[in-house]
Structure formats: structure tokens, C-alpha cells
């Protein structure tokens, strides 16, 4: 890729139907983990007009009212009126959970290669990524796409823009010059709204109250704004589209700036490496960049079901590393335990912490629950690499 280019990422709000499904799945996971931290959970959700379907595989000693959890999640998001197409009080909730297959459980409970550890819950490949485009070490486009829909939610909830409704989408196109974010080329923001508000009022409020307070002002000189481009967005949420768990995996991660292994996160307990290993790979990549070993870092790990140790740990810095990628990979293997149980212990994942992750991104957020965002191994990596002093930060 040329050093001068446009790159786009999108995000969606908590009221987007797929995110409603993700949040219900993770709320159920949290409710179970609060009682049984060793539960095996794969909670899938479908939501449509007036209907929620809960299915998947759960093995637990916990006693959870799944219907109540689903309704409370819908209420918290803001779907509390039948005019919105789904109302927490009156929607139908169907529950169809099975137990985890014993064939899978035997490989997870006792790894074939490591009797002191648990095996991976499935085969698969996972990626982690970090770069120095923002203080959070996230790609600029996805970071700000998240902040836009988060701002939409804040203004809806505090009543400053009372005509806003829960469903919204953002898209940020950034112009890169010499490989660094230079300016914001285009912002798309579509928000569900009350029927009586005019398009002109929506456009002015969205630009002045949502977009401009969020994006860096020095990057907006020639920005194009596309606000509700269809001209009307009254019908939204699960009424506008059927929502499913795990259908926003690029929104959940790096906005397309890094590869994705294909496995979704929400509703899965940390024995599922789709989730826990992706979190660990982000933790590794962020510490590599925070240590000043590279300006950007992509980490791939892969697993076989029932086997504890990763098949591979590969680091790629796209030529930005100050030491060879192979040397960074060796440091990662020495200082990070990427076996499933090692990840769980390293990041303290057997906690009911997942509800917050289900909207506005799993990465790049300074929340106390997000242990994978810590940079506590950066100095250790720097010293192990033989580098002196503190790393130089180079944010856009």
C-alpha cells in the first residue's frame, strides 16, 4: 500500500440490532460467571420485532433467570416503548440452551499436551493489533468511529437531544499522508430519530453536537459530512433489521486495519480462545508498541482443540520494528503465557466483566475491567530487547 491513501472504519451504537444481541449474550455470560466462574458458556441471541431467541450451549451450576436478564438489557439500551419495535416489557423471549458437548468438554478440561493446563476450546487463529496513531494505541478511524456513536448515546441518554433513538451507525474515512493520519476526509453518521424532527435539524445537531466535539478540529478543514443520507431513519433497531450475536466482528476489533480470524467474542466464556486469545494478542501487541519496539504490531496466534500450547505465535511489524520481528516473537514467548489457562490467569478473565465490551469496541478503552489494555509489560520488554530509556510516543 502507498504511504498516501484513504482508509475507512465503521462503528455502531448499542441500539443497533446486532449489538443488542451481543449485549444480551454478554449480559447472560456475566450473570452466569457471577455465580459460577468455571461455567462453559456459548450464548447466542437473535432479536427481531417483538422477539428475542436465546440459544446455544451452557454448562453451569448457576441459577439465572435468562428471560429477566434479556429484558433488563433491552431496557438499559433504551427500547422501552412499543413504538420502537421492541419493548422490554412486552417482547417474547424464547430460551433454547443445551449443555456443552462432552466430546468438547473432555479436551478443554484436560489438555492432551499439558496435564497441568486446559486445552483450547476449539481450533482457530486469532489476531491482535496495536499502533501509535492514538494514545490508546488503536487505529485512528475505528477509535473515532466508536467515539462518535458513544457520543450519540450520551446525548440521547442525558436528554440534550431528546429526539435521538437508540440505533445509530458511524463511518470515518481518514486521509493518510506518509503513513500517518493527516485529515478526516468523510464522516457518515446515521441516527434513528423521532418522526417529527426535520432533516435540517438532525444534520445541524449531529454535526455541531456529535461530530465536531469528538473529532480533532485541526483535521476537519475539508471534511465532508453525510448525516442520515437516506433522509429518514425512524424505524430502527431490531424492528429495522434482525439482530444476531457475533455479526459485528470488525467493529468489535480494529475496523479492518488488521486481519480477523473469524471468531466472534460475545456470549463466550474465556475457555473459548476465539475470545480470550484475541484479548491476549491485543495485550501482547499493545505492550510491544508501548515498549517502543515497533510503531505498529500485528500478532497472530493459533490453536488446536484440546491442545494447550499455541501452534504458532507470529509477530509482524510492517517494517516499523527497531529489532527483527523474529526477535520480538521470541520475547513474546518468553514473557507471555498464551496457553488458555495462562491467558485466563494473566488477564484475570473469570469475572463478570464482559457486558461493557459488547458495545463501542473490545479494545482501546481505558476501563478498569479491560485488563488486556494494560501496558504493564512494556518496560520489561524494552529492557529484554536491550533498549535503554523510555520509548518515544508518536501519536497523530
UniProtKB/Swiss-Prot annotation:
Entry binding sites for ATP: 16, 167-169, 232-233, 241, 247-248, 264, 268
Gene Ontology annotations of biological process type: one-carbon metabolic process; S-adenosylmethionine biosynthetic process
Binding site for K(+): 44
Gene Ontology annotations for the cellular component aspect, listed alphabetically: cytoplasm
Primary location recorded for the protein, binned into one broad class: cytoplasm
Cited Pfam families: S-AdoMet_synt_C, S-AdoMet_synt_M, S-AdoMet_synt_N
UniProt family annotation: Belongs to the AdoMet synthase family.
Role according to the record: Catalyzes the formation of S-adenosylmethionine (AdoMet) from methionine and ATP. The overall synthetic reaction is composed of two sequential steps, AdoMet formation and the subsequent tripolyphosphate hydrolysis which occurs prior to release of AdoMet from the enzyme.
Name this polypeptide is given: S-adenosylmethionine synthase
Source species: Ralstonia nicotianae (strain ATCC BAA-1114 / GMI1000) (Ralstonia solanacearum)
Amino acid at each position: 500500500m502507498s504511504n498516501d491513501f484513504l482508509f475507512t472504519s465503521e462503528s455502531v451504537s448499542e441500539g443497533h440490532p446486532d449489538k443488542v444481541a451481543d449485549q444480551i449474550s454478554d449480559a447472560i455470560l456475566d450473570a452466569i460467571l457471577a455465580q459460577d466462574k468455571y461455567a462453559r458458556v456459548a450464548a447466542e441471541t437473535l432479536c427481531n420485532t417483538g422477539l428475542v431467541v436465546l440459544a446455544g450451549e451452557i454448562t453451569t451450576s448457576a441459577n439465572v433467570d435468562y428471560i429477566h436478564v434479556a429484558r433488563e438489557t433491552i431496557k438499559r439500551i433504551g427500547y422501552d416503548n412499543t413504538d420502537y419495535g421492541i419493548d422490554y416489557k412486552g417482547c417474547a423471549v424464547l430460551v433454547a440452551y443445551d449443555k456443552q458437548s462432552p466430546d468438547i468438554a473432555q479436551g478443554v478440561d484436560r489438555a492432551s499436551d499439558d496435564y497441568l493446563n486446559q486445552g483450547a476450546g476449539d481450533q482457530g487463529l486469532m489476531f491482535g493489533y496495536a499502533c501509535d496513531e492514538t494514545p490508546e494505541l488503536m487505529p485512528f478511524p475505528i477509535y473515532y468511529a466508536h467515539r462518535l456513536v458513544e457520543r450519540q448515546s450520551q446525548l440521547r441518554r442525558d436528554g440534550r437531544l431528546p429526539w435521538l433513538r437508540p440505533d445509530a451507525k458511524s463511518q470515518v474515512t481518514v486521509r493518510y499522508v506518509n503513513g500517518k493520519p493527516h485529515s478526516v476526509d468523510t464522516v457518515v453518521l446515521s441516527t434513528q430519530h423521532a418522526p417529527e424532527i426535520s432533516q435540517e435539524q438532525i444534520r445541524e445537531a449531529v454535526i455541531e453536537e456529535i461530530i465536531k466535539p469528538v473529532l480533532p478540529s485541526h483535521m476537519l478543514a475539508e471534511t465532508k459530512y453525510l448525516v442520515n443520507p437516506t433522509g429518514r431513519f425512524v424505524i430502527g433497531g431490531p424492528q429495522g433489521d434482525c439482530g444476531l450475536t457475533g455479526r459485528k466482528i470488525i467493529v468489535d476489533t480494529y475496523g479492518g486495519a488488521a486481519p480477523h480470524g473469524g471468531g466472534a467474542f460475545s456470549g463466550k466464556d474465556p475457555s473459548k480462545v476465539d475470545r480470550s486469545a484475541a484479548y491476549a494478542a491485543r495485550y501482547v501487541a499493545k505492550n510491544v508498541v508501548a515498549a517502543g519496539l515497533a510503531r505498529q504490531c500485528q500478532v497472530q496466534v493459533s490453536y488446536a482443540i484440546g491442545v494447550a500450547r499455541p501452534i504458532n505465535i507470529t509477530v509482524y511489524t510492517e517494517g516499523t520494528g527497531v529489532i527483527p520481528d523474529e526477535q520480538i516473537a521470541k520475547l513474546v514467548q518468553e514473557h507471555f503465557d498464551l496457553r488458555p489457562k495462562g491467558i485466563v490467569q494473566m488477564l484475570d478473565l473469570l469475572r463478570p466483566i464482559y457486558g461493557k465490551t459488547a458495545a463501542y469496541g473490545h479494545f482501546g478503552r481505558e476501563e478498569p475491567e479491560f485488563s488486556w489494555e494494560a501496558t504493564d509489560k512494556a518496560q520489561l520488554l524494552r529492557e529484554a530487547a536491550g533498549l535503554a530509556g523510555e520509548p518515544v510516543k508518536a501519536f497523530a
